[in-house]
């Protein structure tokens, strides 16, 4: 009886196993029409940036055809977690049989399954290097002196190159309390916190206290400023903050969130993407 129970349990577990897959579409039926008015595909800054740099605006810049997505949403057995205009696909999680059937649709080019990564993140002890450098600087960086001088950024700061006019997109696991921490008061008061989005929860609240704080820490190395106490490496830059990482689970879908955030950053005309994340 015990063996029968274990067998039934195993079969049931397999039947309801959640598979990860990319569903690629055949085309973008609205591409020609969309490219007739390319300025509508980007922010004004992004469009002007592409023109200035001679960047080609093409099929990749056109969003995924919405009727294709709506058709998939109407079906059962899986959930759409992310989409990508650059790859013309959606990322789905669900029952394998339900996902495999999609390949028979006229507007689906192919389906690619991914092996789910189950390893959870491990805590690594933080070792702070307090090496003292001989270079003398005029600014009072206080606790950030070592990191600024290690990168030799004091020379840029002395030329007033502190990020002014630049837009940086930070993609990470969360930015709790950036809207209230005193260290980011300068960022907020100068209207340099341009906004953001939590792609993992489909939420505008990228600074929720329930999110992992790694993004807040990363942002602080660049944007935080307290006179005579702390100076980030680019305190006068403007920032978009995007949540793409789920620290508790570490599954492939996070890479799809990352692509979505990169596409959003490109459409907003950011100058730099900072992503202190790694995937294997």
Regions found by a protein language model. Give the residues of each.
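Autoinhibitory propeptides
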Residues: 67-148, 154-157
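Extracellular pro-sequences of secreted precursors
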Residues: 18-49, 87, 105
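Subtilisin-like serine protease catalytic core
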Residues: 35, 154-254, 268-271
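Solvent-exposed loop/turn segments at secondary-structure junctions
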Residues: 29-31, 87-88, 97-98, 117-119, ...
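Aromatic- and Gly/Pro-rich amphipathic surface segment
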Residues: 37-75
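Short acidic, glycine-rich surface-loop motifs adjacent to enzyme active sites
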Residues: 262-280
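Bacterial Sec-dependent N-terminal signal peptides
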Residues: 1-23
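Active-site-proximal beta-strand/loop segments in catalytic clefts of secreted hydrolases
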Residues: 23-27, 83, 94-95, 114, ...
């Amino acid at each position: 009886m015990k063996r029968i129970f274990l067998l039934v349990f195993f079969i049931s577990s397999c039947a309801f196993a959640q598979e990860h897959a990319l569903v690629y579409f055949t085309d973008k039926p609205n591409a020609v029409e969309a490219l007739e008015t390319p300025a509508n595909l980007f922010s004004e800054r992004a469009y002007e940036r592409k023109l200035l740099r001679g960047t080609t605006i093409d099929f990749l810049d056109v969003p995924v055809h919405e009727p294709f997505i709506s058709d998939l949403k109407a079906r059962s057995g899986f959930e759409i977690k992310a989409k990508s205009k650059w790859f013309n696909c959606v990322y789905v999680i669900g029952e394998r049989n339900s996902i495999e059937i999609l390949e028979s649709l006229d507007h689906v080019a192919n389906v690619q399954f991914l092996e789910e990564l189950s390893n959870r993140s491990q805590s690594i002890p933080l070792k702070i290097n307090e090496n003292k450098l001989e270079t003398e600087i005029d600014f009072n960086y206080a606790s950030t002196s070592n990191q600024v001088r290690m990168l030799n950024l004091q020379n840029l700061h002395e030329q007033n190159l502190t990020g002014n006019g630049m837009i940086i997109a930070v993609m990470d696991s969360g930015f709790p309390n950036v809207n209230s921490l005193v260290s980011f008061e300068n960022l907020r008061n100068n209207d340099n916190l341009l906004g953001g989005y939590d792609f993992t929860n489909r939420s505008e609240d990228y600074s929720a206290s329930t999110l992992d704080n790694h993004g807040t820490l990363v942002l602080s190395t660049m944007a935080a400023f307290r006179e005579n106490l702390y100076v980030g490496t680019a305190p006068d830059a403007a920032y978009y903050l995007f949540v793409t990482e789920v620290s508790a689970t570490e599954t492939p879908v996070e890479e799809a969130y990352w692509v979505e955030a990169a596409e959003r950053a490109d459409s907003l005309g950011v100058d730099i993407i900072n992503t202190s994340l790694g995937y294997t």
